[in-house]
Amino acid sequence: MHEMSLAEGVLQLVEDTARRESASRVKLVVLEIGRLSSVEPEAIKFCFEAVTHGSIAQGAALEIIAVPGAGWCMQCAETVPMTELYGACPTCGSHQVQPTGGTEMRVKEIEIE
């Protein structure tokens, strides 16, 4: 489960930000997770709750925004929606599709007090 190490990385970023801003606690963390990122939102929620126990982020709400997958189809020469990383183009059926979006995971927002 790589979500545990990802949650630990998010916590490190959150703690660094909270420390830099002299915050007393973290109220909310917003993550953007691409549908093609191989990150399971429910697993990251579980892991985030586990790794934040005893930290400045304990009890913080975790909001996840799903980023749709997109890719460039070399046959169609256009951007197409993607639902799986190595899937076929929904327009022409070609497998020559290069992902262009939805593979990322990033911290979009941290609310502190």
UniProtKB/Swiss-Prot annotation:
Binding site for Zn(2+): 73, 76, 89, 92
Pfam family, one: HypA
Family matches, as InterPro entries: Hydgase_Ni_incorp_HypA/HybF_CS (IPR020538), HypA/HybF (IPR000688)
Residues engaged in binding Ni(2+): 2
Domain of life: Bacteria
Gene Ontology molecular function terms on file: nickel cation binding; zinc ion binding
Sequence similarity: Belongs to the HypA/HybF family.
Function noted in UniProt: Involved in the maturation of [NiFe] hydrogenases. Required for nickel insertion into the metal center of the hydrogenase.
HAMAP family associated with the record: HypA_HybF (MF_00213)
Protein's UniProt name: Hydrogenase maturation factor HypA
Species, as recorded: Dechloromonas aromatica (strain RCB)
Gene that encodes it: hypA
